[in-house]
A protein has these predicted regions:
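Cysteine-dependent hydrolase recognition
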Residues: 1-468
Length: 468
């Protein structure tokens, strides 16, 4: 799928948990933010009167299922499709989506035609319609065709500053203009960019952007919640960490070096202890080296450590590996791969991300010698939609031992190359939720394959095949 059909990337579809890796480099220094001087005492630059502030509104009311084929019912693809992702609730023609953005601190003397509006919205029914967007009651962008399940990602530039007729708030309304009362659309996100003063609304963290300036910048920020502690300005472009000057009451001042970067990104963070997250523990992580031949196999078993014990100390997952390595089981070089390890290495630590499996299988196909012949997943899986909407339930982890791909769920896509829908290596799954179920399956598999491989053609040995 094209990344252009992704709506907004503010919220993850897979999990609400973030993992951070602090790496050790034995041959050099890792990247660090460099403490940088803030020479306000000798400043000769005038204070910047405004910056172009972007206020974003992201919606997380529902997981929109995206493009559907309407054949008596709505049928969806397991691949991530147009319009799939977090959105607002469905919006019907009678009642558009309205949002008031407060505390905008508009700079009234700013450039007169420099307001930008962006919107990402999607149709949610098989009806013709146009997308209609209004700022302070004034339509912007004209009537934008968005029929059926089509997606629109629009940027409307050079709007007049006068459209923001209040210095303190912006009213936005978004709707579809279908004549059918039951029509539906959904909005993923929108934003408004406009000239604003350096009033940071008593926030403890404030992200902002500046354009290039070959002379440098002098910033005088007001109404920032520093609680009497010098805040820290992070310069993302330059990798700098600058301590704010709070010697003047009610102000945080910075002198920034000249820059030719077209767009510079900053984040002002309060240094107050109440604004810090305490890390109570760290766990050591040494990645498994899958380039090592000893860690490669041609029968890949992907499972969850929870299934490695049936409650009596028996690891039926490993017994299954032993069976597949035996003559009766096919004489494979069977290996068990821990889903937690794959999440960390191939899913960038993102729990439940399908890339953990898909990218590992791609890697195995390209690097293992010999290449894998089969992939067998041991452990139940849930579609991302079912897991995400229920991840606060303790049972969700028990029912989602090894993640699958998309909604509706598809293990085949875990084994498919990007942009394809056929497996690069045969793949299957045992949807077990405990080690005992793995043992029961293993016993049945042994019996089945023993009978299957038997050369006997007697009625006594083949009668079971007539039992339906």
């Amino acid at each position: 799928r094209s990344p252009d059909i992704q709506m907004c990337d503010k919220y993850s579809l897979e999990t609400d948990t973030a993992t951070y890796f602090l790496t050790v480099n034995t041959v050099g220094s890792n990247l660090r933010y460099l403490a940088t001087a803030n020479p306000t005492a000798g400043n000769v630059l005038p204070a910047e009167p405004y910056f172009m502030r972007r206020i974003e509104q992201h919606y997380k009311s529902q997981i929109n299922k995206g493009y559907a084929a309407v054949i008596g019912e709505y049928v969806y693809s397991a691949s991530y499709d147009i319009g799939e992702g977090w959105t607002s609730d469905n919006i019907v023609p009678c009642c558009g989506l309205s949002k008031v953005l407060d505390n905008i601190n508009k700079y009234t003397a700013g450039p007169q035609n420099n307001v930008t509006f962006t919107v990402t919205a999607v149709g949610n029914a098989l009806n013709p319609r146009e997308l209609v967007c209004k700022i302070q009651g004034t339509q912007v962008g004209g009537l934008m065709p968005m029929p059926y399940f089509n997606l629109r990602k629009d940027t409307i530039r050079n709007l007049p500053l006068s459209i923001l007729n209040s210095p303190s708030f912006i009213g936005v309304n978004i709707n579809g203009n279908s004549t059918l009362a039951t029509d539906r659309i959904a909005v993923s996100c929108f934003s408004v960019t406009y000239p604003a003063t350096f009033n940071f609304n008593n926030e403890k963290n404030f992200y902002f952007e500046l354009k290039d300036n070959t002379l440098g910048n002098y910033l005088v920020i007001t109404n920032f919640n520093s609680n009497g502690v010098a805040p820290i300005l992070y310069d993302y472009n330059g990798g700098k960490r600058i301590l704010g000057d709070i010697s003047v009451a009610g102000q945080v001042r910075f002198v920034l070096a000249p820059s030719t970067d077209t767009l510079r990104k900053f984040n002002l963070i309060s240094g107050d202890i109440s604004n810090s997250q305490s890390v109570t523990s760290l766990s050591s992580k040494t990645f498994v080296n899958y380039a090592n031949a000893a860690n490669q196999g041609n029968y890949i078993i992907i499972s969850n450590p929870i299934l490695y014990n049936n409650g009596s100390g028996v690891n039926n997952v490993d017994l299954y590996r032993q069976y597949r390595s035996s003559l009766a089981g096919g004489s494979f070089n069977a290996k068990v791969y821990n889903i937690d390890e794959l999440n960390d290495q191939f899913g960038f630590g993102i729990k439940k991300h399908p890339s953990a499996l898909r990218d590992f299988i791609i890697y195995a196909n390209q690097q293992f010698n010999p290449a894998p012949k089969y992939v067998f997943i041991i452990g139940r899986g849930l579609s991302y939609l079912d897991y995400t909407l229920n991840q606060a339930n303790p049972l969700a982890e028990q029912l989602d031992m090894v993640q699958t791909f998309g909604w509706p769920a598809s293990d085949v896509l875990l084994s498919s190359l990007p942009g394809t829908s056929y497996p690069s290596v045969p793949i299957g799954r045992l949807g077990a939720i405990n080690g005992t179920e793995v043992g029961i399956y293993l016993d049945k598999m042994k019996q089945y394959e023993q009978v299957q491989q038997s050369p006997s053609q007697t009625i006594e040995d083949k009668a079971w095949m007539k039992n339906v």
